[in-house]
């Protein structure tokens, strides 16, 4: 409680003095007609008329028109404490404060009400000594004197504690006016002023000069019960006598009896919110609520184990300045550093001796408007709390009634800087004020002597980077440092570009013979086969060892919302969040109780001031006057004569930079001395001249980390540093956690009607309404379009047949008749033809999710689709054993800049490093505290003003001034050209999950379009009308910093122009050559936005540039975006119970909660029964084109084609020339000899001989040899057309053989799939029932024995052909010519659509498929296809074999077997060429193989 009171008192004084100043101003205006007041001087210090000051702790003085009246402060004799102490600089002892001496102004909790404080009695100011009278004997107590005239109003006092009510006295008669009182302060105020200085010690912290005596204040509160004598009997009302002379102060009377208990006080304020009551019984289940806000951030987890070293991340964003770390141990003395930069201006020295009064200066510019003080209520309000932090700007209140114009207040003294408030909402644009005239520059004061070295203040907040300074002249090279220790091996740099080929090196010497090498790896494989499809998913491996951290992956697609998780345990209470923005106005509260009486009215016109009298005795309280009405504002008086010079004030803010002096010549560098021992610290020297900027030294090697020092003692609190420049606008912070609830705010006024809200969610479809009443009959419509034919009417009676009349002219269509009665509703019409597509409707709100439909009928297998995009990565496979290092690749192109990674977790603290080489000169330290004031010097004579000097060259930028008041906003400038597009921000925080939309109909899958070429940047469109402000989105995080653009060439030096307007801050350029400092050029117009250039190679790191001077304070930025959601306010007072509301609508379906934690992995279930064979899968994509095979042998001549149909008869030819004479004999007889006799039993002549040609002669016999030849030829042709599967006539496939000879039985036959010569035919087994062609392995079995006796890696197959001694991959076909079978199988695959093969694994103590002990398939045998595809027992069904029998699941010493079968339509995967058992390696584990034939169909 005491701390609260102490913290509040300076603020109370401030309000008193401000109110005091306002009164003075009014008084001054009224007093303009009177004489000027005379100031006082004491000890060389000037005080204005009616100033009050304390020259010593126990003395108080007042200036009365040139005369100084002083008096002693009396202290109370009794203090309610054991060991009172007198603070330094105070007069009266006080009780020591209990508790820590923490005077921090942080907001503490409100304490309980304290005991009434002791108010020391201050005797009034001592009057001038009168003539000494003879000492008289003590006379009897005189009658009560007449009531004195009210003294001039003193300043409003600090509210005192409520006094003990005295006994009611009899009303006395009003006395005659007496002499005026001694001073302008009522006794309670002077006591409080004295008590404030004595008790709190904070009066000096307020930093206010005592003001002059204010006008008459309102009547002070009832004082404490005095310790004067006992109450005498009330005398009869006497005639008002003339006022007698002031008698001497009587001796103190005995202590009076305690007064009666006072009347009840006014009701106190509401107490603090009580403790939360116990939970009530659970209420009825409520309707589903709207989706909740994101929960609070969870606790920080325990620190995990140290992970392996990750890859070097992208450079992180610049972090905020960390807190000051603990002071490390004192390091060893470093070598002498380079000369430092020129230091900043030191603090202002102690004030010099008081000079003679100068001539009155010109009137200064108008001071800033002071804070108007508010009038306090009379009465006894409680103690003021500490000042809270400045709140956010509230919403604009309604326009109040126009108040009467008050008297203008005087300029207040500069108040203490308040806490920086949060940015208010932008105010309406004010009118642009006219620029004031700038005052003349003051004379420069003499430089003070350097103050003592202050203790180091806390590290200030890092300021903004300054603009680059003008490059200094190159300094002399410093002495070369000693070589530093070797640094730690740095990380491997990025690969450089490939260098040119170096010259051939000399041959080296022959090395010693190496040790015996291990068994070599298997030889190179043959040419790779065509790429197979991806293998089936491998069995679930056991959890591998922790891998090294991979590089950060790209930003993944947002996941689907998870199911709601269980509510977590209640977290610990978080720290209070940051102060949120002010909440909206609450509803109007109930009217409060009647307020206290208003303040007294304004003072009447003041009479001529009398001379200040001595303090009279305190008169009895007069009756309260009626509150006066507010007087009209007085006319402003004339400006008074300037006062005398005031005392030198405290050090002001740093002034603007002075003009630059001319550069001195550079002295010659002295020789470098040896390093001496460190001497004792000398007295603080005067500030040396600034050394030139040294050349940055080469960075020393990084030393090893030294041991961590012990935590140093906390240093003394340093002086507060100079207020830094406002930093650049920081990134918008993330949402802080919800802070504690604030107290309920005052009830606000009802706001205006808000804008219409967003479109609501579509409601559920209402029930159909009842039909409405029949409407009134409408007016007759316009003529309608021709109607459709009506229904047939009822059949009429047949009329008499009339004669056919002539066709009349078509009559005009008659008017439509009156509307008939409404017919019954017709039956539903046929659907109309499809209308044209309407305009695209606005996107509707997502409806609730419909129920899942029934599964549809299985569709026909679709056509094979185009090759899809790469699928999402599958589950992470087992970590492979590390492969050998590959050769270094060609350096890749520079990748695009990655998104900024999240900050890594804090690592374990490293051990402290050794002391590194001395760093570059640090930034100048904060200014030390001001030194003790020097002695007063003799006042000098005022010199004549000198003539105006010429304007000096522009000096370097001075230190930043304190931020100026916000200027009036200028008129809007022309909009600048569009800037280049900024980098894309990183993905913002994930928003609240939206309501689930209605399930849309499944669209047809579109083909992916080709990527278009990026269009050129279009012309900038015209500025559109300003849209309504959108809702404030969550703040995005900063995008990555763009690459720096190319450097422009340096321009020629121009002639120095006049100083232009300050341009906007440009990018930091490279330091140019050291030119003479030119005056600042005008800013160039921004160039057009160039097309983005290609990313350049990463440049070498530049050397560190010189530290530039601090830049000027930037213009005030635009108001930032709306801040994050503020903390939740405290619960308001509980309202009256409302009436029961209507039943609410059914709530929307709640959002799915976050996914619960993954459960532990269950053990693998027992394998289910094999399902039915699935339909054949789609045909896979064609394999890569194989290498062309060797040229095959020329095939046998083909079968003669059948005779074509006879063509049409041709025209008769020209008659030929006559032939030569023929030989003698019968041609027909010769034919007959050849062909034999023609009879009817013979078969028809060959088709070549038709009936119109000569028939054979039937007279001669046939030669039987020709018949045999023809039959043989016919048989050969027939076997060529339908080969019989013999070695001489091999079939192409068994399926061909079955088609040509359906009656053949299954067995071994010869086939020649590549046709051509039958020499390379192979012997196969043909299954004539299915048409399969089966090729046997050679050898077809592997004997059972222990093939592998060393431990195998966990769950990795050990290949029989690749890894095991005396093992080999399987071959097929003839053992003598295995290549023939390979070639023929290549053609056979082209002729087949399906392949299958069985393999039997004979086991003893080794698992073939199911591990009966672990109940999983992790140790199942792995098969390898001919395209190196691994075929496994689990995973993708396309790469998974089936098991026909398995008796190898137990390791019981028995021999068992597992029969594997694999069928595939990708025939390139078969035959199986290798087997990889997993469960082998022990001496008692044996296996053998029976390799079945591979069958193609």
Curated annotation (Swiss-Prot):
This protein's superkingdom? Eukaryota
GO CC term (a single one): collagen-containing extracellular matrix
* Pfam families reported in the protein's UniProt record: COLFI, Collagen, VWC
The glycosylation sites annotated in the UniProt record are: 1260, 1398
Q: Where is this motif: Cell attachment site?
A: 141-143, 504-506, 942-944, 1065-1067, 1068-1070, 1125-1127, 1134-1136
Tell me where in this chain the PTM 4-hydroxyproline is found. 288, 291, 294, 609, 615
Q: Which SMART domains match?
A: COLFI, VWC
Any one GO biological process: eye morphogenesis
Query: Low complexity bias: where?
Result: 155-164, 210-225, 320-338, 425-441, 602-611, 744-756, 824-839, 878-891, 1091-1112
**Where do Pro residues bias regions lie?**
168-180, 234-246, 917-927, 1169-1179, 1209-1224
Q: Where is the composition biased (Gly residues)?
A: 550-559, 730-739, 892-901
Residues holding Ca(2+): 1312, 1314-1315, 1320
**Where is the VWFC domain positioned along the sequence?**
38-96
Cystine connections: 1294-1326, 1334-1495, 1403-1448
Extent of Basic and acidic residues compositional bias: 708-719, 774-785, 1061-1070, 1125-1139
Q: Which post-translational modifications are recorded for this protein?
A: Prolines at the third position of the tripeptide repeating unit (G-X-P) are hydroxylated in some or all of the chains. Probably 3-hydroxylated on prolines by LEPREL1. Hydroxylation on proline residues within the sequence motif, GXPG, is most likely to be 4-hydroxy as this fits the requirement for 4-hydroxylation in vertebrates.
Q: What else is known?
A: Mice homozygous for the targeted deletion of the N-terminal telopeptide segment of the COL5A2 chain show poor survival rates, possibly because of complications from spinal deformities, and exhibit skin and eye abnormalities caused by disorganized type I collagen fibrils. The alpha 1(V)-alpha 1(V)-alpha 2(V) heterotrimer makes a critical contribution to fibrillogenesis, basement membrane organization, and cell viability, and may play a possible role in the development of a functional skin matrix.
Q: What family does this chain come from, according to its entry?
A: Belongs to the fibrillar collagen family.
Q: What is this protein called?
A: Collagen alpha-2(V) chain
